[in-house]
Amino acid sequence: MSITYTTVGELKVGSYVVIDGEPCRVVEVTKAKTGKHGSAKANVVAIGVFSGAKKTLMAPVDQQVEVPIIEKHIGQIIADMGDKIQVMDLETYETFEIEKPTEDELASKIRPNAELEYWEIMGRRKIVRVK
């Protein structure tokens, strides 16, 4: 599993964080200073990269959190097999199957021999863009 660590206080909108074992993109960060003897708290709202579910994280700003390492690759579509697509990586020439995207904009562009950009996050793959 490819992850690194950072503090909650360093998270910004648009960055990525692991919440409940799922990589998520941060959409909102609010920080609140508590009383005399408490530490500052941060409320992080994020959306799951794979599930699309909204997740929240409430923690002290100095707490360590996991940040996924995103590997970006270029591939070529070999075959459309219904709910999955067979893709060949253009750097390593490895072939594998990947879930077909549910977004209509991406699904309409899928055809054999088209190039695509996919991300590999924590051992899972997701199609981001079809060229």
Swiss-Prot record:
One of the record's GO molecular function terms: RNA binding
SUPFAM superfamilies cross-referenced by the UniProt entry: Nucleic acid-binding proteins, Translation proteins SH3-like domain
Keyword set, alphabetical order: Cytoplasm, Hypusine, Initiation factor, Protein biosynthesis
Keyword Cytoplasm recorded: yes
InterPro entries xrefs: IF5A-like, IF5A-like_N, NA-bd_OB-fold, Rib_uL2_dom2, Trans_elong_IF5A_hypusine_site, Transl_elong_IF5A_arc, Transl_elong_IF5A_C, Translation_prot_SH3-like_sf
Family, as annotated: Belongs to the eIF-5A family.
Name recorded for this polypeptide: Translation initiation factor 5A
Organism: Saccharolobus islandicus (strain M.14.25 / Kamchatka #1)
